[in-house]
């Protein structure tokens, strides 16, 4: 346990400011298989198991963010098992294969990456059991090994489920009753060392890893609840109002 944060600390919802609310809603509903939980004028809440994971806010007045500015790197949606992760991944493959950007076996988790239609990064992942994680000198051991997405789908999704996802317009039935959470959020920052001081020294997160210009922090022994990198944003200053990340709860 950290000095300031309890072991039960976890991520809440992520709010995104979007230009095209109907298109973004359709993507998160029909491709990522989230349920629409509430619609209130310019705002739509989507999630799984009754829990809101993503809030979309219609903000067509905002400009598109600069690629090298600070902001969202990705929202990471944690799946309870490999079958549900494979189902979501298969839905992406059927619906929007051009938005897929890569994969990673991180030793603590298996992950697949994509962008939404407005360029907001998304990670879809499943955690290995904590008993399989390795720690060295207080830091979690992670890597970024390739995973073949089609092989993963074939290994963890039945033929019937794959057929359902490829032929049924309402693919969300493949995840009926399935839970999900925002497992972590990864940010683009201008100064990783400054971000580390803020999240660790001020907010009380534990530093769990530093890897290739990225900082990973968590509470309660998790591999990371937040990550910050400078891969595209080194030297970026305060973020100006723009489409993309609104807030993280």
Show the residue positions of the predicted features.
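Short, small/polar residue-rich loop motifs at catalytic or cofactor-binding pockets
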Residues: 106-109
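Generic recognition of long tandem-repeat/solenoid scaffolds
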Residues: 45-47, 215-218
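Glyoxalase I/VOC metalloenzyme domain signal
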Residues: 1-38, 48-100, 115-208, 220-249
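Short glycine/proline-centered loop/turn elements that form peptide/ligand docking sites
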Residues: 41-42, 193, 212-215
């Amino acid at each position: 346990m950290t000095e300031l944060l309890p072991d039960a600390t976890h991520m809440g919802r992520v709010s995104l400011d979007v230009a095209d609310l109907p298109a973004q809603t359709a993507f998160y509903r029909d491709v990522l298989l989230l349920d629409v939980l509430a619609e209130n004028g310019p705002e739509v809440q989507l999630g799984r198991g009754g829990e809101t994971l993503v809030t979309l806010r219609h903000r067509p007045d905002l400009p598109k963010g600069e690629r090298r500015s600070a902001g969202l790197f990705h929202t990471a949606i944690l799946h309870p098992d490999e079958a549900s992760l494979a189902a979501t991944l298969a839905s992406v493959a059927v619906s929007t294969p051009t938005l897929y950007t890569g994969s990673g076996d991180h030793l603590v988790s298996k992950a697949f990456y994509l962008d939404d239609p407005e360029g907001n990064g998304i990670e879809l992942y499943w955690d290995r059991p904590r008993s399989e994680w390795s720690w060295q000198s207080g830091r979690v051991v992670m890597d970024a090994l390739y995973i073949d997405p089609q092989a993963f789908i074939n290994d963890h999704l039945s033929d019937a489920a794959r057929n359902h996802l490829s032929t049924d317009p309402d693919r969300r039935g493949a995840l009926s009753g399935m839970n999900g959470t925002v497992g972590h959020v990864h940010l683009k920052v201008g100064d990783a060392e400054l971000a580390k001081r803020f999240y660790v020294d001020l907010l009380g997160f534990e530093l769990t890893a530093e890897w290739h210009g990225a900082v990973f922090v968590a509470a309660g022994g998790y591999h990371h609840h937040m990550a910050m990198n400078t891969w595209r944003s080194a030297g970026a200053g305060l973020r100006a109002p723009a489409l993309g990340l609104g807030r993280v709860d």
